[in-house]
Amino acid sequence: MSALRKSESHGRIGEAVTYAKCWMNGIPAYHTGGLRSNFAGSDLIVETGDSRLKLWIQVKTGAPAHKDSVYLTQCAGDEDLHGEKFAADFVVFVNLDARKAQSHSHDGALNFEHLSFYVVPRADANRLYHDVVTNLAAKPKRDGGRRKLGNMAVHVPQEQMLEFRDAWQRIEAARLRT
């Protein structure tokens, strides 16, 4: 068996634990089965009161670069300055403890205690992301040149995310309204 790449396994771990946390919070969620093109980039589908309507959840997983920040996702490039990055109804940002993310070796040492969850409605996720990317693009490099946004990790200060930490009730409230 080939060795697991952390860049891939962290994303899969984030999706799996978000699925579990939904059910732990009474939210009936299901995997999209890799059919993301049919589900606006979503990883999970949530049942609502109306069997014809579903909520979509996108999961983004990573380790924050700084203790007081929350990792959102990688920037695709200048195209992220225009339009919306996220299309799902909610984005769950799963942040791994940075030390444990680097040191674990798929031996069971990575646990729920090493994870933080930020449950963010689409409009808020897009606003937070856009604000950070716009500021990064406007900030010149030391040599005065323009910063390249492609593949840049996007973080926000943790204090901007406090209202979203473990906010599973937001999904439940939206589910019951629908």
Protein language model regions, located:
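Mixed-charge (Asp/Glu-Lys/Arg
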Residues: 1-40, 45-178
